[in-house]
Curated annotation (Swiss-Prot):
<dbReference type="Pfam" id="PF10255">
    <property type="entry name" value="Paf67"/>
</dbReference>
<feature type="region of interest" description="Disordered">
    <location>
        <begin position="1"/>
        <end position="29"/>
    </location>
</feature>
<comment type="function">
    <text>Component of the eukaryotic translation initiation factor 3 (eIF-3) complex, which is involved in protein synthesis of a specialized repertoire of mRNAs and, together with other initiation factors, stimulates binding of mRNA and methionyl-tRNAi to the 40S ribosome. The eIF-3 complex specifically targets and initiates translation of a subset of mRNAs involved in cell proliferation.</text>
</comment>
<comment type="subunit">
    <text>Component of the eukaryotic translation initiation factor 3 (eIF-3) complex, which is composed of 13 subunits: eif3a, eif3b, eif3c, eif3d, eif3e, eif3f, eif3g, eif3h, eif3i, eif3j, eif3k, eif3l and eif3m.</text>
</comment>
<dbReference type="InterPro" id="IPR011990">
    <property type="entry name" value="TPR-like_helical_dom_sf"/>
</dbReference>
<feature type="compositionally biased region" description="Low complexity">
    <location>
        <begin position="11"/>
        <end position="20"/>
    </location>
</feature>
<comment type="similarity">
    <text>Belongs to the eIF-3 subunit L family.</text>
</comment>
<dbReference type="GO" id="GO:0001732">
    <property type="term" value="P:formation of cytoplasmic translation initiation complex"/>
</dbReference>
<protein>
    <recommendedName>
        <fullName>Eukaryotic translation initiation factor 3 subunit L</fullName>
    </recommendedName>
</protein>
<dbReference type="GO" id="GO:0016282">
    <property type="term" value="C:eukaryotic 43S preinitiation complex"/>
</dbReference>
<keyword id="KW-0963">Cytoplasm</keyword>
<dbReference type="GO" id="GO:0033290">
    <property type="term" value="C:eukaryotic 48S preinitiation complex"/>
</dbReference>
<keyword id="KW-0648">Protein biosynthesis</keyword>
<keyword id="KW-0396">Initiation factor</keyword>
<dbReference type="GO" id="GO:0005852">
    <property type="term" value="C:eukaryotic translation initiation factor 3 complex"/>
</dbReference>
<dbReference type="InterPro" id="IPR019382">
    <property type="entry name" value="eIF3l"/>
</dbReference>
<dbReference type="GO" id="GO:0003743">
    <property type="term" value="F:translation initiation factor activity"/>
</dbReference>
Length: 562
């Protein structure tokens, strides 16, 4: 689907919620749900160590905001003091919060914002940030997951956060670590995805819950989410900044009043990746890649400071290429990011959620790469190829023989969790309605697999000969000659891909064939050419020699220790 820029006019605010939600509505069912939410709240005793932590967390954020206000009044973008405060917040966010969660709230929620509000002087901005972490923890770790009310409240909190950032008269006096900014965008889309699937599963829901969903169609609406992401992109002027950056210019020169601040610049960049993800979940792969048209994927960028953002970008771009039948580009993207993960895996602590997420996407991308290489055999990095053979060697052989069940199994494991942007008809919801987006994408994928079912066998026969009568080769395959000619045409068509060669836009490219065999038909004779490039063993041996030398040095150092 194509979205014109005016569809996301920031003056239109579909993600704003009804003001009367916080009071009685006159609807008995809605009021009952509202009252039940507060009746069930239990005011837990907050441990002293948590009180001290929250006060310290608040003071750090408050000091940063005060300093940022001063910097803005002095017309300065940033300073060493701001950087120092951001570093302190990063330590709190990535270390202290995680350790205290593990110790006190492993499977239980943190104290509610209302309970800690007196500790922080009812600081509205801090409470919004606290609730962002509070609800995210409920989604990730709390047994049973979020209730319907918590899903709604988390949505309202994101509305408050984005309104604070987007609707201020000037740049908001706030800076946050890049990791937290990425996690905000990532979690925002995840919660939308989770709610989209939740509202489609009506079998176990009470009439009260269904009525509550029916009367609040704007909550977690797809237009709300798109509007937020596009507003952040527009506010930051990130596309223009990237355009100038990739052409060798200074992005600051076109950043504008908001985009020169790290908060807006990074949220804008992460929102582009968020749009890539969202359009992929909706099955619009062309639009998914189009939003990245100013990001040069094949070049290390100053904006790529968060590993999870890098991995997510390459996962969705690689998957979109696969579904667009651009196998060569899909293979290149997956191989590049898998090599990156292989070389940087030691950076991630094995106990953190980061490691879990990256490890899962690493496994999924290996599965997708095995599919792409089966459908379009070509050479890739030796170390990645070795890993692939270890993990999926047997399944790749079965896929080469046309086993559709293995294709489906790997696709099911590795594909994104597709969703429908449409609110279901609650009066008549199919029990499998939540599966329909996945089944639609699976059908598209398996149709393509079916079209290529004979190609692997044809390729293996073509490799054996230089010339062969068409009728004879058709006989080997037990196909009528006319059907075999059709399959040869399919082979020619499917082995020719649109391939990115240069330029910034990932949609650009030229038609190429990387098939190891090529042929032409002259009258009733097939003439076959082996286009396989001889393997360069020299590079492989040089890499192994370097590894051996490093190992030798390490062993010598160990032997020298007293």
């Amino acid at each position: 689907m194509s979205h014109a820029k005016e569809d996301y006019d920031s003056s239109y605010d579909p993600y704003s919620y009804q003001a009367d939600y916080d009071g009685h509505t006159g609807d008995p069912k809605q009021d009952l749900a509202y009252e039940r939410q507060y009746e069930q709240q239990t005011y837990q005793v907050i441990p002293e160590v948590i009180k001290n932590f929250i006060q310290y967390f608040h003071k750090t954020v408050s000091d940063l905001i005060d300093q940022k206000v001063y910097e803005l009044q002095a017309s300065r973008v940033s300073s060493d003091l701001i950087d120092q405060k951001v570093y302190e917040i990063q330590d709190i966010y990535e270390n202290s919060w995680a350790k205290l969660t593990e110790r006190f709230f492993k499977n239980a929620p943190w104290p509610e914002a209302e309970a800690i509000a007196p500790q922080v002087g009812n600081d509205a901005v801090f409470l919004i940030l606290y609730k962002e972490l509070y609800y995210r923890h409920i989604y990730a770790k709390v047994t049973g997951g979020p209730t319907l009310e918590q899903r709604f409240e988390s949505y309202y909190n994101y509305c408050n956060l984005f309104n604070y950032i987007l609707n201020a008269d000037g740049p908001a006096p706030l800076e946050l670590p890049n990791q937290w900014l990425w996690d905000i965008i990532d979690e925002f889309i995840y919660q939308f995805q989770s709610f989209s699937q939740y509202r489609c599963k009506t079998a176990k829901k009470s009439e009260e819950e269904i009525e509550f969903l029916r009367s609040n169609p704007k909550i977690w609406n797809v237009h709300s989410v798109l509007n937020v992401l596009h507003s952040l992109v527009d506010k930051s002027n990130i596309n223009r900044q990237l355009e100038v950056y990739t052409s060798g210019g200074d992005p600051e020169s076109v950043a504008g009043e908001y985009g020169r601040h790290s908060l807006y610049k990074m949220l804008g960049y992460f929102s582009l990746v968020g749009l890539l993800r969202l359009h992929s979940l909706l099955g619009d792969y062309y639009q998914a890649i189009k939003v990245l048209e100013n990001i040069e994927l094949n070049k290390k960028s100053m904006y790529s400071r968060v590993p999870e953002c890098q991995v997510t970008t390459y996962y969705y771009v690689g998957f979109a290429y696969l579904m667009m039948r651009r196998y060569q580009d899909s293979i290149r993207v997956f191989a590049n990011i898998l090599l990156y993960i292989q070389r940087t895996k030691s950076m991630f602590q094995r106990t953190t959620y980061k490691y879990e997420m990256i490890n899962k996407q690493n496994e999924q991308m290996h599965a997708l790469l095995s599919i792409a290489l089966t459908m379009y055999p070509m050479r890739i990095d030796e170390s990645i190829h070795t890993q692939l053979r270890e993990k999926y060697g047997d399944k790749m052989l079965r896929m080469q023989k046309g086993d559709a069940q293995i294709y489906e199994e790997l696709f099911n494991y590795a594909c994104p969790k597709f969703l429908s942007p449409v609110v279901p008809n609650y009066d008549n919801v199919n029990p499998n309605y939540h599966k329909e987006p996945y089944l639609q994408q699976l059908k598209v994928f398996l149709d393509e697999v079916q079209q290529q079912a004979q190609l692997s066998t044809i390729r293996s026969f073509l490799k054996l000969y230089t010339t062969m009568p068409v009728a004879k080769l058709a006989g080997f395959l037990d196909l009528p000659e006319q059907e075999f000619r059709i399959q040869l045409l399919v082979f020619k068509h499917k082995m020719k891909n649109l391939v990115w060669t240069s330029g910034i836009s990932a949609l650009e490219g030229e038609f190429q064939s990387a098939s190891e065999v090529d042929f032409y038909i002259d009258k009733d004779m097939i003439h076959i050419a082996d286009t396989k490039v001889a393997r360069r063993y020299g590079d492989f041996f040089i890499r192994q020699i370097h590894k051996f030398e490093e190992l030798n040095k390490t062993l010598k150092k160990m032997s020298q220790k007293p």
